[in-house]
Swiss-Prot record:
GO terms for biological process: cardiac muscle cell differentiation; centrosome localization; cilium assembly; cochlea development; establishment of epithelial cell apical/basal polarity; establishment of planar polarity; inner ear receptor cell stereocilium organization; intraciliary anterograde transport. This is Intraflagellar transport protein 20 homolog. It comes from Mus musculus (Mouse). Disruption phenotype: Conditional knockout in male germ cells results in infertility, abnormal sperm morphology, significantly reduced sperm count and sperm mobility. It is found in: Golgi apparatus, cis-Golgi network; Cytoplasm, Cytoskeleton, Microtubule organizing center, Centrosome, Centriole; Cytoplasm, Cytoskeleton, Cilium basal body; Cell projection, Cilium. It holds the Pfam family IFT20. One of its GO terms (cellular component) is photoreceptor outer segment.
Length: 132
């Protein structure tokens, strides 16, 4: 009966017969909730560490991907510039070939003219020798 009167007043005895303000069942639930909260906070901390590691890994991979992308862009630009240089060199060589062909044709015409002059001079010399 004394327990009932104390219970109505909000006072309770625990298993060690100590006077408590809270009901022992509520106290037990509070302790369990506190432990669950601690476990939850620990798990959240672990989760944050894992997520932080994943974020760092993703950032690192993103940086590596960006570096590779820049290397690829650089290589592509280098290939384009090499192609343009080769095209310019090819045009220069074609112009040089055309110039050399023109020069060759000029030399051929000059050679034919000189051969004709030589033949005329030889004929003149032959006529001069036979006349004497």
């Amino acid at each position: 009966m004394a327990k009932d009167i104390l219970g109505e007043a909000g006072l309770h005895f625990d298993e060690l017969n100590k006077l408590r303000v809270l009901d022992p069942e509520v106290t037990q639930q509070t302790v369990e909730l506190k432990e669950e909260c601690k476990d939850f906070v620990d798990k959240i901390g672990q989760f944050q560490k894992i997520v932080g590691g994943l974020i760092e890994l993703v950032d690192q991979l993103a940086k590596e991907a960006e570096n590779e992308k820049m290397k690829a862009i650089g290589a592509r630009n280098l290939l384009k510039s090499i192609a343009k240089q080769r095209e310019a060199q090819q045009q220069q060589l074609q112009a040089l070939i055309a110039e050399k062909k023109t020069q060759l044709e000029r030399y051929r015409v000059e050679y034919e003219a000189l051969c004709k002059v030589e033949a005329e001079q030889n004929e003149f010399i032959d006529q001069f020798i036979f006349q004497k």
